[in-house]
């Protein structure tokens, strides 16, 4: 019996006992306890110091506020978060829902690197494992292991994640390209470069607003998709997992909160399937198509929609 089958059996057995709050899918929540007293590897130490340090820097936001710093924060969030993480890392690199000229693919991927959520290889690999093992005990950030585990604590136990999922075996399409191998090896140096440039052009206020506030905002909005959108919302599609559509999270994340749509049609470049579901990232992709830059754009067919509908 393979690991996927075992995980599904565990989830099915647990499902007979309890439900997550406000969810239509029954499952027993088994909180994953982070072992704080242990031998920490360098990855986990970096994660907790980096994320913790950024949160501490955010405490200086009121005293360092200026409109110039605010607009730097806003611009970098829009560019790195929307074009980088959402459009590039997620919809382009992970799911291959559309194609870009290689130079533009590489540029957007580098922009995504500066959202500071990890290098493209790590991000793509982790998210592909999430879709392969969605909401089972093999999911890297499974909601059945507790809200705070799937929101943030999973980042502090890389050994546990590797033991569950493996490393980059599912991201071979990126690892065979020297550009992505380079970004994977040198990620931390790009973090230092970003900090140095922000300090050079705006001093400590730019570090606080352009790096800390902007990055922490992006972190928690992305993490809310993992935690909230696998717990609260509506489920128009029969995905067999806990994914939900949450309009509030969708508004905050440029369309990523239409998460049940995404799990039903993960290959789709469009997450806001209905006309009224605002999906800013989709509008950008359509603009790129109009400019002749985005091609082979994938969206769900009416046949596939009928197949995935609860009304089927």
Curated annotation (Swiss-Prot):
Keywords attached to this Swiss-Prot or TrEMBL record, sorted alphabetically, are:
Fatty acid biosynthesis, Fatty acid metabolism, Iron, Lipid biosynthesis, Lipid metabolism, Membrane, Metal-binding, Oxidoreductase, Transmembrane, Transmembrane helix
Q: Which residues bind Fe cation 2?
A: 130, 230, 259, 263
Positions binding Fe cation 1 in this chain are 90, 95, 127, 131, 262
Q: What positions carry the motif Histidine box-2?
A: 127-131
- What does the UniProt cofactor note say? Expected to bind 2 Fe(2+) ions per subunit.
Instruction: Write out the GO biological process terms.
Output: unsaturated fatty acid biosynthetic process; very long-chain fatty acid biosynthetic process
TM spans, by residue?
A: 45-65, 69-89, 193-213
Necessary cofactors:
Fe(2+)
Which EC number(s) does the record attach to this protein?
1.14.19.37
What InterPro entries would the database entry show? Answer: Acyl-CoA_DS, FA_desaturase_dom
Q: What is this protein called?
A: Acyl-CoA C20 Delta5-desaturase
Which species expresses this protein natively? Anemone leveillei (Windflower)
